[in-house]
């Protein structure tokens, strides 16, 4: 099997999915998940009234192990769409994402649009068959959600070094007409074992803009990261400003060890987000507090742009350390949770949008 050439058609349409917020706001796991120990409570349905999502196109199951050119597909990682893969000539491990061949344009369009950037993951190779499309990505060394869940609060120099990379990835996407919509800590993965270098992954669901107008109408978001304007009754909202809000939630979580807005009841959670009131943890520097407040503004037009974040004094003053220190802070109150039921997995064609992550 040969690698398929990635030439973007001149009249390629953009994909804008319409998805619902999931009823279960307490996990990110789809219905196809392993048995969990103990009862798993279900939360009441989301108070938002949204149009139902279109039925996804499911990729046929792949029998493993199977040979694809120089690769061998091993066991599935998350459901039936993501597999461990081994590049036989070099022994390098990859992650292989499998899609129906008919989704080739929608899956690859964000990567066609976006020039190379050091903090945005790209497929190392794409193989196209008659029924399936195989995209191979270098295997990461964990993600930011897992790091914060394990470490709790990160010291400011370390948080700044990591957040600078996250903001640079978002600024690059916005500069080239991509709105991420479902931005969260888990989408930033480490490329090194020391966990100092980050890349943004999973651009397949990004919205590709056709012009300078970034207005969106869908409700594609993770409840813990959703902006107040998405919860309002207004017809449209700025996709870029919504991404910046989500990045602000990520920064707060890195510095505090818990989300800025939390509640076990969806209606109360969304009420807190609409009000936009949150308490910053003690001990943060004035520049760090300033940056968080500049991102978590209720009014979208008052938030910093993604490129403006990189100019903020907190990121300019905190030089990247030679070796990132280990955090000794540990918060027991509403931390990014551990335990079963919180690992990310994907429904085929639709993300399960949980409270944690």
UniProtKB/Swiss-Prot annotation:
Limits of the Protein kinase domain: 68-316
Keywords, comma-separated and alphabetical: Apoptosis, Nucleus, Protein kinase inhibitor, Transcription, Transcription regulation
Location in or out of the cell: Nucleus
Xref: PROSITE patterns: PROTEIN_KINASE_DOM (PS50011)
Matches recorded under Pfam families: Pkinase (PF00069)
Biased composition (Acidic residues): 341-350
Chief location category: nucleus
Positions of region (Interaction with DDIT3/CHOP): 1-127
Region feature Disordered, mapped onto this chain: 1-63, 333-357
A GO term for molecular function: transcription corepressor activity
GO cellular component, one term: nucleoplasm
BP GO terms, sorted: cellular response to insulin stimulus; intrinsic apoptotic signaling pathway in response to endoplasmic reticulum stress; negative regulation of DNA-templated transcription; negative regulation of fat cell differentiation; negative regulation of fatty acid biosynthetic process; negative regulation of insulin receptor signaling pathway; negative regulation of MAPK cascade; negative regulation of transcription by RNA polymerase II
Domain notes: The protein kinase domain is predicted to be catalytically inactive.
Subunit note: Interacts with AKT1, AKT2, MAP2K1 and MAP2K7. Interacts with ATF4. Interacts with DDIT3/CHOP and inhibits its interaction with EP300/P300. Interacts with APOBEC3C. Interacts (via N-terminus) with APOBEC3A. Interacts with RELA.
Similarity comment: Belongs to the protein kinase superfamily. CAMK Ser/Thr protein kinase family. Tribbles subfamily.
Function: Inactive protein kinase which acts as a regulator of the integrated stress response (ISR), a process for adaptation to various stress. Inhibits the transcriptional activity of DDIT3/CHOP and is involved in DDIT3/CHOP-dependent cell death during ER stress. May play a role in programmed neuronal cell death but does not appear to affect non-neuronal cells. Acts as a negative feedback regulator of the ATF4-dependent transcription during the ISR: while TRIB3 expression is promoted by ATF4, TRIB3 protein interacts with ATF4 and inhibits ATF4 transcription activity.
Protein name according to UniProt: Tribbles homolog 3
Originating organism: Bos taurus (Bovine)
Gene: TRIB3
